[in-house]
């Protein structure tokens, strides 16, 4: 199992017609302050948001956290109020949990759970992320939550999960999101093993598209891994979980250590300033994992993994084609400036030579 760095959080209660779901939540937020450092730890188990779950979907449960880094203990000095939500009177003003039939759990995170839900009035199937207000405050991640909502709410791209809005009640904040039918890529790989090169190339192309779009908006994802990629119909994939995402305007360099150990780039491990090239590195790790079934630098301990990452110690099985190896090597360059641009990833020979077979998938 792979460790990941923690974050997440939520709270809220409101409403408007879901018939206007195509209009994303508009939020007036400031970009003040650094990203808070978070500890991994285990959140206290909370009561289910409903005692009776209707089976609305067959989505997967994510109980496979990867190795993560301890970066901060919770702050227990604050109350349970979440100030960032007080000045928002948006479309979902009167929505409550009672407007939904609650289905099975799709995933579990540090600060909450994701459920499959059906809106009673419209029949719309959505994913509902329920997060504990108390823990948002305890772990001092109000700004992070605000940024996550603002960033995801700004996206309009077929390979990024859509945020419809949020609402809250006394105990929790709820993010209402697009439901992606087949669930996590991680679980698919775990159950089925590595992908063939045709399907892998299609997934990598879509990921490059999504990241290119995010980077064009000066946003870094910073936590790319199969757990944060969902599979929809027709092999369409969607990047999700923007809890570590951050603005990176004017070529600004970041310093916060975050992400999943197997996917960390050399500059993150060495605590250097970094930019959107950390996402490019992570795409290289993902490409390898799609084809091989495990990350390229995975070892028994964090220290051993770090050593292999810093040496760019790549070992390819014989079944990985020369063209796929070439792309992976060009993505996993030690120096960020030498990593292949995303625009060139989309036109790389490995992608181009497999493109003609994508319609047969």
From Swiss-Prot:
PROSITE patterns reported for this sequence: PROTEIN_KINASE_ATP, PROTEIN_KINASE_DOM, PROTEIN_KINASE_ST
One Pfam family here: Pkinase
MF terms in GO: ATP binding; protein serine kinase activity; protein serine/threonine kinase activity
Residues that, per the record, bind ATP: 106-114, 129
EC number: 2.7.11.1
Residue numbers annotated as active site: 223
CDD domains: STKc_Aurora
Catalytic activity from the UniProt record: L-seryl-[protein] + ATP = O-phospho-L-seryl-[protein] + ADP + H(+); L-threonyl-[protein] + ATP = O-phospho-L-threonyl-[protein] + ADP + H(+)
Annotated function: Component of the chromosomal passenger complex (CPC), a complex that acts as a key regulator of chromosome segregation and cytokinesis. Has a role in error-correction of aberrent kinetochore-microtubule attachments to ensure that sister kinetochores become bioriented and connect to opposite poles by promoting spindle assembly checkpoint signaling.
Entry protein name: Aurora kinase
């Amino acid at each position: 199992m792979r460790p990941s760095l923690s974050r997440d959080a939520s709270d809220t209660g409101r409403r408007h017609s879901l018939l206007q779901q195509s209009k994303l939540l508009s939020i007036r937020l400031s970009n003040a302050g650094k990203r808070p450092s978070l500890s991994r730890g285990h959140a206290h188990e909370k009561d289910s948001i409903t005692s009776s779950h209707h089976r609305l979907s067959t989505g997967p449960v994510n109980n496979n956290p990867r190795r993560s880094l301890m970066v901060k203990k919770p702050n227990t000095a604050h109350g349970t109020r979440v100030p960032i939500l007080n000045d928002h009177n948006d479309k979902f003003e009167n929505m409550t949990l009672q407007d939904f039939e609650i289905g099975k759990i799709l995933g579990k995170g540090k600060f909450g759970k994701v459920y499959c839900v059906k809106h009673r009035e419209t029949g719309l199937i959505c994913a509902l992320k329920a997060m504990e207000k108390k823990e948002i405050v305890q772990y001092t991640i109000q700004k992070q939550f605000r940024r996550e909502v603002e960033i995801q709410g700004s996206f309009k791209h077929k390979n990024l999960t859509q945020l419809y809005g949020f609402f809250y009640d006394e105990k929790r904040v709820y993010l209402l999101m697009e439901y992606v039918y087949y669930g996590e890529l991680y679980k698919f790989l775990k159950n089925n093993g590595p992908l063939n090169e045709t399907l892998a190339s299609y997934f990598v192309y879509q990921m490059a598209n999504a990241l290119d779009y995010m980077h064009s908006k000066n946003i870094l994802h910073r936590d790319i891994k199969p757990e944060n990629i969902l599979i929809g119909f027709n092999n369409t994939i969607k990047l999700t979980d923007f809890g570590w995402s951050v603005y990176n305007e004017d070529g600004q360099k970041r310093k916060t250590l975050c992400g999943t150990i197997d996917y960390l780039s050399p500059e993150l491990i060495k605590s250097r300033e970094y930019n959107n090239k950390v996402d490019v590195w992570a795409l290289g790790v993902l490409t390898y994992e799609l084809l091989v079934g495990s990350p390229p630098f995975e070892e028994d301990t964090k220290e051993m993994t770090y050593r292999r990452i810093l040496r760019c110690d790549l070992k390819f099985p014989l079944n990985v084609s020369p063209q796929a190896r070439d792309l992976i090597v060009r993505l996993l360059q030690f120096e960020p400036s030498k990593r292949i641009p995303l625009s060139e990833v989309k036109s790389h020979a490995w992608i181009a030579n497999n493109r003609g077979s994508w319609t047969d998938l």
